[in-house]
A protein has these predicted regions:
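Hydrophobic/aromatic beta-strand elements that line small-molecule binding cavities or substrate pockets
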Residues: 35-37, 69, 90-96, 119-127
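A short, structured loop/turn motif at beta-sheet edges
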Residues: 40-45, 95-102, 124-133, 168-174
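Beta-strand/loop substructures that line and gate deep hydrophobic ligand-binding cavities in soluble
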Residues: 110-157
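Cleavable N-terminal signal peptides
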Residues: 8-9, 19
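Short beta-edge strand/loop motif at the mouth of beta-sheet-based domains
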Residues: 54-91
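Bacterial N-terminal signal peptides that target proteins for export
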Residues: 1-8
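A mature extracytoplasmic/lumenal domain signature
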Residues: 43, 50-52, 83-85, 96-98, ...
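Hydrophobic ligand-binding cavity/cleft-lining segments
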Residues: 19-66
Length: 174
């Protein structure tokens, strides 16, 4: 193989996106973002990690410095952030759990909490070969001054980054 071909192949491997994500639609009344990520681990291990968000959700995308995230999988359970000084935020609420395969959460992530908007965040997990594919979507509707379409790309970027963190965390457990 030529040195140039090897260099090109190495560059492609190093720059390959860990997840496929996109803004599927965006209007003043709402948006849909989503994608999928292939994870080199069995679904059971991915599920365990997915349901422990404190281990993979970036500390740069939390309300409170030094906070912890928890997820109660009971219906109506809280994806909550707790600061050491007692401050707490209920980011999402558990709507549906199919252990090992599907998780649906409802609510407004981040600054959407203070808007007249809410959404459904769905994770579908399937085995693929020796690994897994995690497909996700976040569908948001409601009202905010200036419309919701401008929120779609930033929300997609944040969620895509978090799921890349999840992939890295799960695959590093080998």
């Amino acid at each position: 193989m030529s040195r140039r071909l090897i260099s090109t192949a190495a560059l492609l491997v190093l720059t390959a996106a860990p997840a496929h994500a996109e803004v599927k639609s965006a209007t003043p009344g709402g948006f849909e973002v989503g994608g999928s990520v292939a994870i080199n681990a069995p679904p059971a291990r991915v599920w365990t990690a997915l349901t422990a968000p404190d281990d993979w959700w970036s500390r740069d995308h939390r309300w409170f410095k030094g906070s912890t995230l928890s997820l109660d999988l009971a219906p109506g359970g809280c994806w909550c952030e707790q600061a050491q000084d007692g401050r707490v935020s209920r980011h999402l609420e558990t709507a549906l759990v199919e252990p090992g395969s599907k998780l649906v959460l409802r609510g407004g992530l981040g600054p959407l909490q203070g808007q007249g908007a809410s959404g459904g965040l769905t994770f579908d997990l399937k085995a693929e070969g020796a690994g897994s594919v995690l497909t996700w979507s976040y569908i948001v509707g409601g009202y905010t001054p200036g419309g919701l379409e401008g929120w779609a790309a930033p929300v997609d970027n944040v969620l895509s980054a978090q799921l890349a963190n999840l992939k890295t965390r799960v695959e590093a457990a080998d």
